[in-house]
Each structure stands twice: as C-alpha cells, then as structure tokens.
Amino acid sequence: GVSEHPPWVDIDEESGRATGIEADLVTSFAEGIDAEVEWRPGPESVLATGIKDGQLDLVIGGLTTSAPWSSHMALTRPYASVPSAGGNEEKMVMGVRMGENELLVELERHLARAQGEVR
C-alpha cells in the first residue's frame, strides 16, 4: 500500500505508479527478494485497515514512529531522521503486516544497507 507524501512517495495519477525515496527503496528491495511490487494507493487510514486485514504486505508513505497505526502493522526500525516543523526529529519507518517477521527482518536489512543513500 502506498500513500502520497512527497518527497517520500509521489503517485502518478495516470499510471498509479509510485516514485520517490521510499518507492525506490521498496522497488530495489522487491528486486532483491525476487518479488513483484503492486502499488495500491490510498489514504493512510485505509491502508492501515488493509494491512491489518491481510490485504497488503507493506505500507509506505512518509510514516514516522509517531504514526497512529502501530496497532495495525509492525513498524520497521527507523531508517532516516528528518527535522519536523516543530524543530524535533521525525524518524521515518515503513509498515509490514503483523506476523510477517521474515519480511520485516529482510526489509530492515535492506534499509540498513541503503541508509547511506537516504538522508
């Protein structure tokens, strides 16, 4: 699942294809595990329900550790920190379906390897 949140994720309205920092990370992760990405755009609340109900494996869209969806999905360890509007640091994460521990571990490894590319 993907929620538009530039620069982390942009969604092309015609094709439905996602681009941006997180979309690139997910695409390279999928290539590394020989998986195919199917972008399902939507608001965070709908995606949170979809992942909780088992309809999605992964949710991206500029999620942070303060996102209200931690009861719906397992959040990765933060892979980047950015300044927030209030002057604090926001820690960026992605969401994985609960119980998908192997996927979570592999994604976190990928994010750790790519961390030098993400600011």
Predicted features, each with a name:
Residues 23-33, 84-119:
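Extended ligand-binding regions for polar small-molecule ligands
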Residues 13-16, 73-76, 109:
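Short, glycine/charged-enriched secondary-structure capping and boundary segments
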Residues 10-11, 69-71, 106:
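Short glycine-/acidic-enriched loop or helix-start segments at secondary-structure transitions
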Residues 5, 40-101:
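Acidic, polar ligand-binding/catalytic clefts
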Residues 1-62:
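Extracytoplasmic small-molecule ligand-binding "clamshell" domains
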